[in-house]
Amino acid sequence: MELSLQNKVAVVTGGGAGLGQACALAFARAGAHVAICDVNESTITDTQAQIEALGVKAVGVVCDVSDADSVHHFFQTAEEELGGVDITLNNAGVAAPLTLLADTTEADFERVMSINLKGTWLGMRESLRRMLPRGQGTIINMASAMSKKSYPGSGFYTTSKFAVAGMTRNTAVEYANQGIRINAICPGNILTPLLKQSVSEDVQRQLAEAHPMKRLGEVDEIANCAVFLASEASSFMTGALLSVDGGWTAL
């Protein structure tokens, strides 16, 4: 099975920490040069150094994925400094407080949708405009297990990820005959550094119990799937929503 990304250029939004960082490092280990963006400059600097230590080129840009000009600048920089865009992982996203719909605010809605949905759309658009002239490219969107299953109180987050899933499938069909593959990863609860810091061990155990496998996922388990979807090993896959959730959505 061919999992090499040798000399490819991978672009990762939200690549400074968590799942984005894990995926960026996995792409680098597979041989890709990697461009990352994030809103936090310090995490960019650290992750960029880790990527370069793996013997590949790295670019880091501060970027607000909800802003079209900022996203354009990021992709333009990646293209100019690394020579193109072969792989895009639209990973940047935010959660929202658990709130029933009647109690939500317009500000909550705008924040979640502008980053999770608009940010993914902008990343896809910039990618396609660079990939289509070359007749090849792979786009991976970070959806969620909640793009397949309802979860009371998570309305805006769930809605944004359902929309990402729908946009993934629809756009995959639009460009399937032009050398572009577009898929999404749908993670369950993953033991990211942020989750470890912000959620008590008791709550972590409760989250683990909700999965049939009775544990939380590891960031590398998501990163491995990203490498698979970016590689020729998944060459006949497009429009797929890949569940990596310990069986949660199978319940």
Task: Give the residues covered by each predicted segment.
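Active-site helix of classical SDR
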Residues: 124, 160, 168
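A conserved structural motif in NAD(P)-dependent oxidoreductases
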Residues: 211-222, 233
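Residue(s) in the substrate-gating loop at a strand-loop-helix junction
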Residues: 144
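Substrate-binding pocket helix/loop in short-chain dehydrogenase/reductase
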Residues: 99-101, 105-110, 195, 207
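Alpha-helical segment proximal to the catalytic Tyr-Lys
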Residues: 129, 173-174, 235
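Short, small/polar-rich loop/turn modules that mediate ligand/substrate recognition or access, typified
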Residues: 176, 181, 237-239
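Short C-terminal tail/terminal secondary-structure segment
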Residues: 95-98, 149, 210, 227, ...
